[in-house]
């Protein structure tokens, strides 16, 4: 699970950095929020943002300092919060659940850094021993992130009628009139929302494998319908988290049961 999360976080940041170097116009409102002009954003700051994100991805992959994992988590939350801050809605924040849930799960798994500043600047290599509390907390960070991204993506369809969803349906030969007449957008949205709730309630292996297949299909529709490939790459948490939860299920169950047994009885 450690290496899966580590590689996943690295790819997430490499993909996000790629978007910055590509000077994605979708980022302009986020810079405008801080009074930065479109010209300055496109000519300078997008390159800087992209370069920093790529550096973070490479550091996580080759030299994973704990402080870098903390940055990855905080930056994931911050960039996700920018979406509702510029009026894009809270579903956007939820849909980025993998962007902050995945690095948080990794940070918790390696034990964080505690109150020691020096420890934060040490490598977060694969731990030889992980406490039961850390196993359980890491599991829930990953599970919560996966549930949120499913619920957020479902909200796009059920409540916001995102225009690019019609392109997804068109890819399968369904025009807008058919989609609206059959309420397919609402059905799809609520299906994903309920899928996210199901992950929170009982994350069984069959459910998680289905979620993996579902997210691979729905996110591959982005490049297949004309969106930039980095939109698929930077959402690798959508695919890494269900695998991580399946692989770590046994360890999580043992840790959870030991913690329950250690609680004092009244």
Regions found by a protein language model. Give the residues of each.
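Perimembrane loop-to-helix junctions flanking transmembrane segments
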Residues: 28-42, 168-179
């Amino acid at each position: 699970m450690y290496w899966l999360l580590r590689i996943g976080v690295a790819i997430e940041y490499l993909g996000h950095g790629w978007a910055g170097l590509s000077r994605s116009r979708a980022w302009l409102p986020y810079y405008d929020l801080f009074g930065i002009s479109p010209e300055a954003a496109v000519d300078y700051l997008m390159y800087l943002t992209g370069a920093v994100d790529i550096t973070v991805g490479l550091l996580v992959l080759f030299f994973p300092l704990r402080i870098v994992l903390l940055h990855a988590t905080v930056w994931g939350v911050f960039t996700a919060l920018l979406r509702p801050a510029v009026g894009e809605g809270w579903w956007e924040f939820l849909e980025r659940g993998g962007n902050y849930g995945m690095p948080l799960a990794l940070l918790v798994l390696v034990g964080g850094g505690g109150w020691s500043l020096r420890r934060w600047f040490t490598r977060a290599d694969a731990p030889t021993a992980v406490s039961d509390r850390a196993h359980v907390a890491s599991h829930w960070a990953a599970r919560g992130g996966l549930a949120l991204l499913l619920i957020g993506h479902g909200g796009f369809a059920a409540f916001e009628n995102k225009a690019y969803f019609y392109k997804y349906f068109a890819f399968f030969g369904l025009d807008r009139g058919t989609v609206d007449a059959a309420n397919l957008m609402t059905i799809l949205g609520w299906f994903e929302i309920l899928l996210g709730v199901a992950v929170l309630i009982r994350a069984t292996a069959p459910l998680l494998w289905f979620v993996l297949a579902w997210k691979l299909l729905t996110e591959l529709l982005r490049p297949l319908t004309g969106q930039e490939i980095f939109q698929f790459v930077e959402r690798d948490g959508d695919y890494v988290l269900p695998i991580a939860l399946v692989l770590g299920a046994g360890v999580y169950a043992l840790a959870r049961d030991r913690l329950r047994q250690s609680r004092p009885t009244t």
